[in-house]
Amino acid sequence: MSRRTSAQKRSVNPDPKFNSRLASMMVARLMDSGKKSLAFRILYSAFDLIQERTGNDPLELFEQAVRNATPLVEVRARRVGGATYQVPMEVRSERGTAMALRWLVQYSRQRPGKSMAIKLANELMDAANETGSSVRKREETHKMAEANKAFAHYRY
């Protein structure tokens, strides 16, 4: 383990169009090989599609989708006397948001179809309606934590 002092948290600059830190974090997760302008284009295209289909504010729907995909508890491996236990632990808000964004991008990429903007828009709309793979992943994470509740006293 590093003996240095822990690294300073970097502040996230909000995106230029919506002035949202969450949208900026999403762009960072979408970005591939440093192509940030392409990631912005994909996100904004997805927001335009959401606006067309629902008529609602796409940023509100996006925030709702992230809230619905954010896990509250997770299991972490803890080794005790030769045995490894899956210990349920609460998730800090920043980590929960990061996990939700990662899952939204991951399951958007796995969807069938051509355009990433369309796939992302569909995943965001599904997550906002509490369906979709990213919300299912959160439910699985919660189930795992519930199943391993007996090992909660090993928390660290």
Swiss-Prot record:
Gene Ontology molecular-function annotations: rRNA binding; structural constituent of ribosome; tRNA binding
GO terms under cellular component: small ribosomal subunit
Alphabetically ordered keywords of this record: Ribonucleoprotein, Ribosomal protein, RNA-binding, rRNA-binding, tRNA-binding
Chain coiled-coil ranges: none
Subunit structure: Part of the 30S ribosomal subunit. Contacts proteins S9 and S11.
Functional description taken from the UniProt entry: One of the primary rRNA binding proteins, it binds directly to 16S rRNA where it nucleates assembly of the head domain of the 30S subunit. Is located at the subunit interface close to the decoding center, probably blocks exit of the E-site tRNA.
Listed HAMAP family: Ribosomal_uS7_B
Protein name, as recorded: Small ribosomal subunit protein uS7
Organism encoding this protein: Synechococcus elongatus (strain ATCC 33912 / PCC 7942 / FACHB-805)
Recorded name of the encoding gene: rpsG
